[in-house]
């Protein structure tokens, strides 16, 4: 069972000189809300792709930590005719279940990215979230007067979630929030700065995962504003774990 945890991701990661793609598993298993939740970070060498466009039963989020890459969204297991969109550090894409997709590194430097991958009981909803891109450079500005400044990026039902919610938060030095528990799993990717949670300091590219029902708080313990992405995984099992 996956529980609340903090993962340090120290860049640069070592590349694979043969395969040109190397995944580093962080965790994988069931949570109180999901049949399976997995997370890994990968490094992809310049000029390479890990596979042709493929599809699977799980839903995914891919967040660029360092570098940039092209995301290909296709109708089948081929690259011809695919929609191509370039993502840079701090940007991400959501893939619904069974969407053909792949990543391709065209620039001259490696790209490092983190992925959440999950499945659960089907959510009883009609209008589902389709493939969705967020570009860091298009993020709404934070309020200059607020110590804790979250900005909603999107929230929408998916095939396995009553709601997938994403927001970007700026946290000024000394600001934070007290421990509380949520009725959903939360994944956080720190983009910059230093925060403290669960008695641990988390810096840029660090991962925080809060399991539903477990207490957690956060505080900026650095000298600069911290910025992080937050993903809330609202499960149809919610009534069973409240």
Task: Annotate each language-model stretch with its function.
Residues 41, 61, 109-124, 209, ...:
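A short hydrophobic beta-strand segment most commonly corresponding to one strand
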Residues 76-96, 197-216:
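Short acidic-glycine-tyrosine-enriched beta hairpin
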Residues 50-53, 71-72, 83-84, 95, ...:
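Short beta-strand His + acidic residue motifs that chelate non-heme Fe in jelly-roll/DSBH
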Residues 1-36, 88, 112, 116-163, ...:
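A short, N-terminal "cap"/entry segment at the start of jelly-roll beta-barrel domains
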Residues 43-44, 55-71, 75, 118, ...:
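Short, conserved beta-strand element in jelly-roll/cupin
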Residues 21-28, 40-56, 154-155, 163-182, ...:
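Conserved short histidine dyad/triad with adjacent acidic residue
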Residues 48, 61, 68-70, 100, ...:
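Structural motif
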């Amino acid at each position: 069972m996956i529980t609340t945890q903090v993962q340090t991701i120290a860049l640069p990661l070592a590349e694979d000189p043969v395969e040109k793609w190397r995944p580093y598993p962080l965790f994988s298993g069931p949570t109180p809300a999901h049949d399976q939740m997995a997370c890994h970070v990968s490094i992809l060498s310049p000029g390479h792709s890990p596979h042709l466009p493929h599809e699977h039963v799980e839903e995914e989020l891919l967040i660029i930590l360092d570098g940039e890459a092209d995301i290909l969204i296709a109708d089948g297991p081929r690259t011809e005719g695919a929609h191509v969109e370039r993502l840079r550090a701090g940007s991400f894409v959501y893939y619904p279940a069974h969407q053909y997709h792949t990543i391709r590194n065209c620039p001259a430097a490696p790209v490092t990215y983190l992925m959440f991958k999950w499945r659960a009981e089907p959510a009883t909803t009609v209008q589902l979230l389709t493939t969705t891109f967020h570009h860091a450079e298009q993020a709404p500005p934070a309020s200059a007067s607020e110590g804790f400044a979250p900005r909603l990026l999107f929230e929408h039902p998916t095939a396995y979630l009553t709601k997938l919610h994403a927001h970007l938060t700026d946290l000024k030095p000394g600001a934070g929030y007290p421990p509380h528990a949520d009725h959903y799993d939360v994944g956080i990717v720190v983009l910059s700065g230093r925060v403290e949670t669960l008695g641990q300091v988390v810096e840029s590219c660090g991962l925080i995962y809060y399991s539903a029902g477990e207490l957690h708080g956060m505080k900026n313990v650095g000298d600069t504003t911290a910025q992080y992405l937050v993903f809330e995984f609202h499960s149809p099992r919610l009534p069973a774990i409240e």
